[in-house]
A protein has these predicted regions:
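Structural motif
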Residues: 3-4, 7-11, 27, 32-35, 81-83, 86-88, 258, 279-281, ...
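N-terminal beta-strand-loop-alpha-helix module at the start
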Residues: 1-42
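Intrinsically disordered, low-complexity Ser/Thr/Pro/Gly-rich regulatory segments
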Residues: 136-368
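Mixed-charge intrinsically disordered linker/loop segments at interdomain junctions
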Residues: 94-165, 169
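A broadly used, surface-exposed interaction patch
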Residues: 27-87, 91-106
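Short, acidic/turn-prone active-site loops that include or flank metal/cofactor-
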Residues: 10-11, 32-36, 59, 112-115, ...
Length: 368
């Protein structure tokens, strides 16, 4: 007798992925409609199910009890034990599948979405909540929604070094001296051919000294070091801040990811992504203290709104989104007020310089 996990396929990917990880079995039965074939492909990719010999797909009419019962009767055997996940699919699919399997050797499960647990609803009078022993990783999450991971960044230096850089930019940044050094570094960042020695760029060594940043080579910077100094340090800082706050594993959080859904869609870049309470969270990190002018503040917000709207409406991915910036966000400034108001409509949380300087930091930014 073998164990077979039965899953109902719908737009929700995570409940099925959770049960696949939680219940190692001998074979899999997926019940779906014709329209859900692509989503099943994403689920199998995320779960690492590549052996077609242990996978059976049953195409049904999602709104027909008779069709579902007839097709299940043709393939289900009394020789197996069935574990049935009723969380997804249409209501009729769930009811029809539940009615069918109750007359067979089976267990029926449902994932309510609250807490990190699922319910065994059959057999037995009691309906115990059972804690998941496994967790969904960030990579599994995005794969389950059809995304390809094009790039992942890594922390350039230690969290302690990045903490020093953060404190300098937040409290001691000199727009005249440091701003000039950053202009030079940005030009070098755009030069993809080479990154020459400092030469006459005497502003840069002084800037590095004030930051307490020690490069690999004393007289020039690597490409990655220049990227770090011109803004990516803030992504690294927020990554470590969030990871420590929620005690996340390396598999639950990422920095500098580039995701693409389908070859015809433009890749999206994300500064910090993480999974918390089985939900995807995105933080866009912008060190706009380096630049002057309210148009930059506005562009950060509108760019993020566009990205969130595209993810939701075109790519089917919903995430809690935040913008972290070291700019002074003055809502009385007419040039950015409309963008901030629009961000609120999209439930995008914005944390500015004042939030990072607040006496209750960092707890205050996680309560917004």
């Amino acid at each position: 007798m073998g164990n077979i996990l039965v899953s109902l396929i719908s737009d929700q990917a995570i409940p099925n992925l959770e049960m696949i990880k939680e219940k190692p079995v001998d074979a899999y039965l997926f019940i779906l409609t014709e329209q859900m074939k692509e989503k099943l492909g994403w689920l199998k990719e995320a779960a690492g199910l590549k052996d077609s010999s242990i996978i059976q797909e049953l195409i049904v009419d999602a709104f027909s009890f008779e069709d579902i019962d007839k097709k299940l009767s043709a393939i289900v055997s009394d020789d197996h034990h069935y574990l049935v996940n009723l969380t997804c699919g249409t209501k009729i699919m769930s009811l029809a599948v539940s009615d069918f399997f109750k007359d067979i050797d089976c267990e029926l499960f449902y994932i309510p979405g609250k807490n990190d647990s699922y319910v065994r609803i059959f057999p037995g009078i009691k309906k115990p909540y059972i804690s998941f022993k496994t967790k969904i990783t960030l990579e599994e999450y995005v794969l389950a929604y059809g995304f390809t991971i094009r790039h992942k960044s890594k922390l350039l230096t230690s969290p302690e070094q990045t903490e020093k850089v953060f404190n300098y930019f937040l409290n001691h940044f000199n727009h005249e001296k440091d701003g000039e050094a950053l202009k030079i570094l940005r030009k070098k960042r755009e030069d993809r051919k080479s990154f020459p020695h400092f030469g006459d760029d005497f502003e840069v060594p002084g800037f590095l000294t004030r930051l307490q940043f020690i490069p690999e080579n004393p007289d020039h910077l690597t490409k990655n070091e220049i990227k770090y100094l011109t803004g990516e340090w803030f992504e690294d800082y927020v990554y470590s801040l969030v990871k420590n706050k929620y005690q996340l594993s390396d598999e639950e959080i990422g920095v500098g990811w580039q995701l693409q859904k389908g070859e015809n869609n433009t890749p999206n870049e994300f500064d910090v992504l993480y999974i918390k309470d089985k939900k995807l969270n995105i933080i866009e990190c912008k060190t706009s203290v380096m630049l002057s002018g309210t148009s930059f503040k506005k562009n950060i917000i509108t760019e993020t709104i566009y990205k969130v709207d595209s993810l939701r409406n075109n790519l089917g991915l919903f995430a809690k989104t935040n913008i972290f910036t070291l700019s002074d966000l003055n809502e009385s400034d007419a040039s950015i007020r409309s963008s901030i108001d629009r961000a609120k409509e999209y439930k995008i949380t914005i944390c500015g310089k004042a939030d990072f300087q607040d006496e209750n930091f960092p707890e205050n930014i996680f309560k917004k």
